[in-house]
A protein has these predicted regions:
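Structural/interface elements that position substrates and couple domains in central-metabolism enzymes
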Residues: 28-484
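Short, Lys/Arg-enriched N-terminal segments with co-localized hydrophobic residues
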Residues: 7-28
Length: 484
């Protein structure tokens, strides 16, 4: 088979056995070692793939068609690349093949357009030898011990290794600690006899997808790329340059991995700062939101971050733990980062304390009180509940005997969340009506979706605890709105 193959691995997936005629076992692989003499000339592997990329003839494969992988697939499909998407979830595959979507910011119309331009979805992982390049962007969660869980990355690399052929480009996109590409992915890919930088090419380029962001999307967000060696870097830069507005090459995969960890840790520690100031300023009778709005009028030296009920999403609450873990492996302590994590983790307890105080002021205990949580997605106007602080808030309120329910126009049913003690709630979003609002003892604003009419909610709810400053400017009797 001439030329190289490109495989992009991205998204939210759950790996068991890969489906298809030749399934990959979870713990064992059968990889054929190819003698060097049987390989194509190594000198012929690099240039043909560069040419195919520039002519947009290279086929792009994406494993994991979730919040990262599907927008990435669209970015390449829109530029004329044939895209083959992989996912172990056959339901997702069937829906995509029908031109349907399951992600809010990638509409069915967009998916139909992708299909018309040659996009194909499959759950048959033995087809991994068909694309011309490989990008890995599978989830990288934490274990119960809050340590890096690279299961999805490792299983993806094993799946690729079984089908890997000379000339393919593999790019890891999953957020992870510096060293993962070289120390974890490379040895797995080389287990069949092919050598990175000679027989196939390897790079790291961190995903920067921001679901729900109408200003920035996959094609417009600059792409940082670090190659294992110069030819791998050249190929990865050439590939992303075809679909992205800007590509930023760095010296190594480790530099690119460290870049993403820096970005997310920077955000986490600054949110921790304003969360701590929120607690302090509240004690002093100062509105932290007013202070931030005033401070951001300074045209230099200040960037606004906002407090909230806790961190959410698949990156910000998790990635700093990857950095602290690898720091400990090097005999160092990241005290500042770990302290920020403690502050952010404490926010749900702080909010529940404010709810309890507000109810006590009305002569009611938390136990037995009806509390409606508004918004269970981790941020505004997305349908992603991963790591949402709403789950911890719900846990804490249930433990104190509250009667809890929720409304979220984007989350019709709560998914099972393994971290939580009451994770099998099987709770569905309640309709937001005048009668339901009036029947609650407290309405807790967790996520400020734009679909909510705050004046209407304030009018009919007896008590509101607002963690997002969503009710700013809304007239209400004194004490009806409590900021937390």
């Amino acid at each position: 088979m001439g030329g190289g193959h490109l495989l992009l691995i991205a998204g939210s997936v759950s790996f068991g056995n890969f489906k298809g005629q030749r399934p990959l076992p979870r713990t064992t692989m059968s990889i054929t070692t190819i003698p060097p003499g049987d390989l194509e000339s190594r000198a012929d592997l690099h240039r043909p793939l560069v040419a195919r990329i520039h002519k947009r003839l290279a086929r792009v494969g994406i494993i994991g068609l979730g919040y990262v992988g599907l927008p990435l697939a669209r970015a390449f499909a829109d530029k004329g690349f044939a895209v083959l998407g992989f996912d172990v979830d056959s339901t997702k595959v069937i829906r995509l093949q029908r031109g349907e979507s399951y992600i809010g910011h990638v509409t069915a119309e967009m998916v139909r357009g992708m299909r018309e331009r040659g996009f194909e979805a499959t759950d048959r992982f033995y087809r991994l030898d068909e694309p011309d390049a490989i990008l890995i962007c599978v989830p990288t969660p934490l274990t119960e011990a809050r340590e890096p869980d690279l299961t999805y990355v490792i299983e993806s690399a094993k799946g690729i290794a079984e089908q890997l052929r000379p000339g393919q480009l593999v790019v890891l996109e999953s957020t992870t600690y510096p060293g993962t590409t070289r120390q974890v992915v490379q040895p797995i890919l080389e287990s069949g006899g092919l050598k990175a930088g000679e027989d196939f090419f390897l790079a790291f380029s961190p995903e920067r997808e921001d679901p729900g962001n109408s200003k920035f999307s996959a094609p417009t967000i600059p792409k940082v790329v670090g190659g294992l060696e110069p030819r791998s870097l050249e190929l990865a830069v050439a590939l992303y340059s075809q679909a992205m507005a800007a590509v930023v090459p760095v010296s190594s995969p480790e530099a690119a991995e460290a870049c993403k960890i820096l970005e997310n840790t920077y955000r986490a520690v600054n949110i921790a700062l304003v969360n701590e100031l929120k607690v302090l300023y509240d004690r002093m009778g100062i509105d932290v939101w007013e202070v931030i709005e005033a401070a951001k009028t300074k045209p230099f030296g200040f960037q606004a971050f906002y407090p909230g009920p806790g961190l959410g999403g698949h990156c910000i609450p998790i990635d700093p733990f990857y950095l602290t873990w690898v720091a400990h492996k090097h005999g160092l302590a990241t005290r500042f980062i770990e302290l920020a994590g403690e502050i952010n983790t404490a926010m749900p307890s702080y909010v529940v304390g404010k709810v309890a105080d507000a109810l006590n002021d009305r002569g009611k205990p938390v136990k037995g009180s009806k509390i409606l949580l508004l918004g269970m997605a981790y941020k505004r106007d997305v349908d992603d509940p991963r790591e949402s602080p709403g789950f911890e808030l719900m846990e804490l309120l249930l433990e104190r005997g509250a009667v809890v329910n929720y409304n979220d126009p984007h989350i019709p049913v709560l998914p099972d969340m393994r971290r939580y003690r009451h994770h099998r709630l099987h709770m569905a979003s309640q309709g937001l009506t005048v009668g339901h609002l009036r029947s609650q003892d407290c309405v807790l604003i967790v996520t400020d979706h734009s679909a909510y009419s705050w004046p209407w909610i304030v009018e009919h709810a007896p008590l509101i605890v607002d963690t997002r400053n969503a009710t700013r400017g809304v007239a209400a009797p004194e004490g009806k709105i409590v900021r937390a």
